[in-house]
Amino acid sequence: MQPLQISAIVALVVAAIIAIVVWSIALLEYRKLLRQRKIDRLIDRIRERAEDSGNESEGDQEELSALVEMGGHDAPWDIDDL
């Protein structure tokens, strides 16, 4: 093989690896975005039910807690523990 062919093959392999890494990062960010949207919808639903009935929905709070624990993220609301 000529050096030009070898360098072309190496360039294609490097480009494929870079593409896989970029798409993997994009997929992870997209999944994080979907999880955050789901959490936001649950928070909105809890707020609406609390306004309507005067108390919060236990099922929605449990689902929200499970999502927050599953994602390993802190609570999406602000907590001031000063």
UniProtKB/Swiss-Prot annotation:
SUPFAM superfamilies: HIV-1 VPU cytoplasmic domain. The modification Phosphoserine is found at residues 53, 57. Gene3D superfamilies: HIV-1 VPU cytoplasmic domain (1.10.195.10). Residues 29-82 are cytoplasmic. The chain crosses the membrane at residues 8-28. InterPro entries: Vpu, Vpu_cyt_dom_sf. One of its GO terms (biological process) is symbiont-mediated suppression of host type I interferon-mediated signaling pathway. Phosphorylated by host CK2. This phosphorylation is necessary for interaction with human BTRC and degradation of CD4. GO terms for molecular function: CD4 receptor binding; monoatomic cation channel activity. It holds the Pfam family Vpu. Residues 1-7 are extracellular. Ion channel activity is inhibited by hexamethylene amiloride in vitro. Enhances virion budding by targeting host CD4 and Tetherin/BST2 to proteasome degradation. Degradation of CD4 prevents any unwanted premature interactions between viral Env and its host receptor CD4 in the endoplasmic reticulum. Degradation of antiretroviral protein Tetherin/BST2 is important for virion budding, as BST2 tethers new viral particles to the host cell membrane. Mechanistically, Vpu bridges either CD4 or BST2 to BTRC, a substrate recognition subunit of the Skp1/Cullin/F-box protein E3 ubiquitin ligase, induces their ubiquitination and subsequent proteasomal degradation. HIV-1 lineages are divided in three main groups, M (for Major), O (for Outlier), and N (for New, or Non-M, Non-O). The vast majority of strains found worldwide belong to the group M. Group O seems to be endemic to and largely confined to Cameroon and neighboring countries in West Central Africa, where these viruses represent a small minority of HIV-1 strains. The group N is represented by a limited number of isolates from Cameroonian persons. The group M is further subdivided in 9 clades or subtypes (A to D, F to H, J and K). The N-terminus and transmembrane domains are required for self-oligomerization and proper virion budding, whereas the cytoplasmic domain is required for CD4 degradation. The cytoplasmic domain is composed of 2 amphipathic alpha helix that form a U-shape. This is Protein Vpu. It comes from Human immunodeficiency virus type 1 group M subtype B (isolate BRVA) (HIV-1). The gene is vpu.
